[in-house]
Each structure stands twice: as C-alpha cells, then as structure tokens.
Amino acid sequence: MRRSTGSHRSRAVVLAAVAALGAGLLSGCADDGDDGSAGSSGGGDSKGKTVVTVGTYGVMGFKQAGLYDEYTKLHPDIKIEENVIDPASNYYPQLLTHLGSGSGLADIQAVEVGNINEVTTTQADKFVDLSKADGVKKENFLDWKWSQATAKDGKTIGLGTDVGPMAICYRKDLFQQAGLPSDRDAVSELWAGDWQKYLEAGKDYAKKAPGGAAFLDSAGGLFNAAVSGGSEVYYDKSGKPIYKDSPAVKKAWKLATDASAAKLSAGLQEFTKPWQQALANGKFATASCPAWMLGQIKEYAGDKYKGKWDVAAAPKPANWGGSFLSVPQAAKNKDEAVKLATWLTAPEQQAKLFEKQASFPSAQAAYDLPQVADAKLPYFNDAPIGKIFSQAAKDSPTQVLGPKDAVIKQNFTDVGLLQVEQQGKSANEGWKAAIKTNDNALDQ
C-alpha cells in the first residue's frame, strides 16, 4: 500500500501529470490473485510474451492507476502478472523463505519500509544493485529514502515507491452531528501540536456520538501514528534495540491505551475484513491517515461516503510507511524486471500514482510546486492533500530503522494492543505481552 520515486526524466513531466490531480482516488482494489506465496517466478506465456511477475501486498496501486496497462502498450512483448498477499505481515515471512531457498520469487518484489533495514543488512547479496540501472538517478530520490535501501557496501537494492506523511481523516458529517467543528482548518486546530488534544476532541465527540460510530478505528492505528513522529523509536542510532525504554514508544502506548480505556476506539485491527466492513458501514469517525491510507478509505468506504470524509492536519508531523521495489538475483526475467521497476518508480509514474491513489511523492522538489501543493481530491471533500502532506513530509523527523522494526511494531499493535482492545486485558498486561513477544522475536 505505497508508491513511487525518482528516475531519469524531466520534472516537467511530473508537473504535467500531477496537474490532473483531483480526478479521484482508487478505482478498485488490486487483484487478490495470490497463491499463498510471496511471489511466483516469471517466464513466458503461450503467446510468446515475456511474463514479468510482481509480488506485492495491500493496495500498491500500480494496476489501479493503469500503469501496468500503459507499460504493456509501450512494450507489447511484455505481460505483467501481479501476485498480492495481504497484509504485509503475511507477505514478508514468505519472501524471506523464498529468498532462503532461491526459488518461488517474483521478478519484482515489494519491500515495506519496516523490513528494508533487515533486507539491506542480511539479504542484500540476493538482490540486484538498482543504483546501476539505466535511468536511475539518486538525486531524484529523497536522501533518506535512498539511504534506507542502501547497504553498507553502497549497493542499493530497492527503489522507493512512496513516503507516508501523516494526517487525520475524519467524517465531516459525523463531526457536525456530534457538535464539533467540521471545517478542516478548525478541525486541525482542535488538536494542533498535541496528540492528547486529539483524545480530548474524541471525548467531546463521544458525548453526542451519532449512530454508534466510535471516534477512531483502532488503538493500534493511533499508536503507529503517534510513534511515527519519533526519530529513535525501536532502535537507537547505534543499532541497539530500545523498545522497552523508548520515550516515544511509552508515550504512544499510553495514548493508545488511554483511548481504549475511554471507549473512543472501535477496537478494530486495521486492514482486516472487520475493519474494511466498518468503513463500509460508517462505524468510526476518524482514522490516522498517512497519505497511502486515503486509497484504503476510498476503496472500502465506497461511493456512499464520497464527500463525507475529509482530511485535517495531524497533531504532530510524522511519517508512517512507504515501500520499495526490488529485483531478486534469482528473478527469471531479471533484465526486464529492472526496466519495469525503474519505469514504475520514475517521476512521471509517481505523479500518476499520486493522481489516482494519493500515494505521496518521494521527490521533495515537487512539494512546493502549485501542481502538487494545490492538489485536491473530490472524494475527500476537495481536501488540499498536496498542501497537507507536503507540510507533514517537510516537518517529519528522520527515523532510525532497525532490522526488526516491522516485527516490533506489529507486536505492539497486534499482540499487546489487541489484547487490551479485544480481550479486556489491562494496559500493563498488554505491555508485558508485547515486550515478551518482542524479546522472543529478537532472540531468534
């Protein structure tokens, strides 16, 4: 569920594509064509075309934005097959298994930012160095985005697809019914500068909560949003795990468990079927919204709620998420895979993904340009997403990543906080469960 960054072509092309922004978001969910593996190796089809396989998770949007169709029209001898596994927590272990065996890999494999450090430190020799690919230029990428996928020997094994600057998505109509401000500037002001103010707004909302709709979807989502505003979260700059004592983690944990205790959360696990159904049925009024989340909301809330969702600034700047495209050395169609990965992450394709998916560009040079800064999305009440996310991206701290970032984060949300939200455990019991699970994971 993420997207693009630089290549060799003129930024003018980016502007031309982004100028069309406002046409809307996601038109449909990616094929759920997975066969239980992180990828399937490519080859040829019965018509003599070269089949390039792409292993992804969630809604990355290449298909939805028409990029696969566009590429195959430009290259009629190529056929693209996308294999989707959802969520990323299921996808990544399978990717590691296939890397270990050297078989079953797609020609292109997506890697989520929470896993990229482990891949660059332990698996880099199993991927192509994309910094040497024709058309790839380092300067087209945010420095920190490029460095996240660069190993110690200088080999860059992934091209960034997006970044995840933070906002808050909210149901304007539910805020009105609850007697809260509904104008996005006024809503942003409700909680400006402090996540605790966000909870206070939730308590005011709960006094007149309409139709049984909770204030927020998930304590786990709130935790991830708040913790993503830190620079040293699960690891310090020396590479030492600090999740037990991290001030950022402890503060986000208290925020999330306080929200649960105050019954502000719908108690859902994000990205699951119940969460998707809750969106479709209007069962919560806000969600922590990195840029890529807008595509999720539009997809699962559907046309029924077009114009009722809006986007406000987050209490504090943060970056949650982002992905990369990598090409395994074991890819059957390695040369064609490199060409496709380079093309998919080129600036003009990045702009098309922004247009269709609200997948926020990694090209910082585009942020202040009017075609990006003034971008609006009809589904979200013409929210100025270019302005909102540009500011959040500029203000977000550079995060220290460690090998097990994704695992640690998942255990806090899907073990600790789920026990609190869905099993009635205390905040302290949930914390101990998360810490124990993380300790065990890091000992393996």
What annotation goes with each model-predicted range?
Residues 84-94, 113-114, 191-197, 267-281:
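Short helix-initiation/N-cap motifs at beta->coil->alpha
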Residues 118-122, 146-186, 217-238, 320-326, ...:
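Periplasmic solute-binding protein
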Residues 199-202, 239-269:
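Glycine-centered hinge/linker elements that transmit conformational signals in sensory
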Residues 112-167, 306-310, 376:
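Hinge/lid segment of periplasmic solute-binding proteins
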Residues 131-141, 185-192, 232-251, 299-304, ...:
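Short, solvent-exposed loop/beta-turn-alpha elements that line the ligand-binding surface or hinge
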Residues 380-434:
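C-terminal capping/gating helix-and-loop segments adjacent to ligand/active sites or protein-protein/ligand interfaces
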Residues 2-117, 135, 182, 332-336, ...:
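Conserved N-terminal structural module of periplasmic/extracytoplasmic solute-binding proteins
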Residues 261, 300-362:
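Extracytoplasmic/periplasmic substrate-recognition and gating elements
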